[in-house]
Amino acid sequence: MLAEVVLTPSEGKRLIAKAIAHMPIVKLAKENGTVIVATSTTNAYVLEELLGKEIKEKGMFTAGVVTKDGLQITEAKGRGDHTVIQKGKVKTVKVPELGDILKEMGPGDIFIKGANAIDPFGQAGILLGGIGGGTIGAAWGYLTSNGITTIIAAGLEKLVPINLTDAVNRMGIMKVDIALDVKCGMMVIGGYIITEMEAFKELFGVDVVPIGGGGIDGAEGAKIFLLDGEDEAVKEAVAMVKTIRGEPKLTTRTIKQK
């Protein structure tokens, strides 16, 4: 059976979150190991699905953010912190505390991160607006040296048609001459990238082909997908899409740039 569905960016985030919470490796680490959910707007949805609790200001579950005004930094007041789930117990931490937790983690544990870009070569790019590289700057050494499983939650709206390594070589806070907002560098990382395509596959076992994108009247950034699979699986996928239709768009509060 074939079905066409359209997902807005917010609906895509919800789908991705449901899939990550459904992954056996995440379920196992949540109960028997450690899961770190780093701040990002997509990860606000992930945290809701993992904990079964609403995050009222999902647009504040991030430090750096892209808005209609460009690359911005969220206000410190009301900004979400990274969340750690250790054997079912939940706590929040800030960047300086991550190292003490990460150094004890290993392959059976999970670090979930959002991204600003993904490329066709399995790489994810994270914009760095602060000296030292923020969250990923503090975490990446531990993730790679300890073999911690990294899951990258990113909708196909983040897909760019280049090798991100080429972008990194051109970028840097001290390289950019002019910026209308926050100057950025970039770090390229690897891991299990979960887009809407992987999410549908994880949840329903259907094949997914993106067949279009964009829209107006609230569908800006939307993606159109063709779902292909057994009748019951496709019907279940479509039924789930109906439940997330109308997922509200996110808003945030940012620091006024000079």
Positions of predicted regions on the chain:
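Conserved phosphate- and dinucleotide-binding cores of soluble alpha/beta proteins
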Residues: 2, 6-22, 26, 78-249, ...
